[in-house]
Amino acid sequence: IPTDSGQESIASHGLVTQQLQIVPMQNQGARLLSTVLAGDTDRASNNVMRDYFTQASNARRISTSLRFLSGNATLDTKAESDISRISEIVRSNEYEGYEVLVFGFSDSYGSLDANLALSERRAEAVKDVLLLENPGYLEGDAVRSYGIGPIAPVGCNETADGREQNRRVEVWIRPRA
């Protein structure tokens, strides 16, 4: 039930809604700590992780992850509707003057370079849709995309479900500098 009243009805019955939340970086502790603890020790991975943390440090994450089919930058059906919900947040007066950060991720299968390129294509695909859906609200320089590759997994890459969870894009917002 995608309407606000439908989601409120679901919440009133104690069920989990699909309403998006805005989560500050400070509330991402346990999730991001696992990234550091599971991090690779090679220099390229460490640089990507550092860049991710630097960009997201004063940002807030929109609470949905956009999923992709394996090996490509094609959004799944749910992600297409989630982008519309993200656009509603972007267009709200509350976030006027904010920029949007789009972080693409991959599972760990394949080389780091290939996964970084794939995750960048995923982030770019979401960026393109956000720009297309929000003329007058977002201009090219208000949306930045980054490929993070397999650096920050949310699932175990040893299982199909875990790999699916890791093939995602996260959208964050922060005040423009």
Q: Which residues does each PLM region occupy?
A:
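Periplasmic peptidoglycan-binding/tethering modules of Gram-negative envelope proteins
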Residues: 2-99, 175-177
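Periplasmic OmpA-like peptidoglycan-binding domain that tethers envelope proteins to the cell wall
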Residues: 78, 105-177
